[in-house]
């Protein structure tokens, strides 16, 4: 079992994600917020045009189901899983996150695009790691109402789980945890 959580001292806001495997693989996350952003279960069909801001649309795209807030027709996913069984969750990481400005000659992915960008084109954690190593997680807000959220991420399939953090010292750090 792999569990990722973060709690601010004295704060009520905390999220926990977990992935464990017996004969099946289970992936999930809670959302410990005192208020709602209007989140709902959202299904993004195959080949949905996300309109990524700085990257081209992938040539193939998997269907995604998860919890999201819909703004201007765009699913702002909190956590989700694709049709291949790859799951991804964003968890609070306030005070630790650093998103870069757009970097020339890198694949620039906005923080709000990160979950669908990975899930629409990857089947496994290994494929996700390959894409993450080539990308820049950038600081472009979704809108004036939705600035970049201070999140770190858990990505999991039936064999492997990683944590992804965008921090100033090393840009993007990936922590691997082999499931038992």
PLM regions: where:
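Short linear motifs in intrinsically disordered
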Residues: 3, 68-70, 140-146
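Weak global preference for isoleucine
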Residues: 13, 41, 64-65, 70, ...
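A contiguous strand-loop segment
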Residues: 13-107, 139
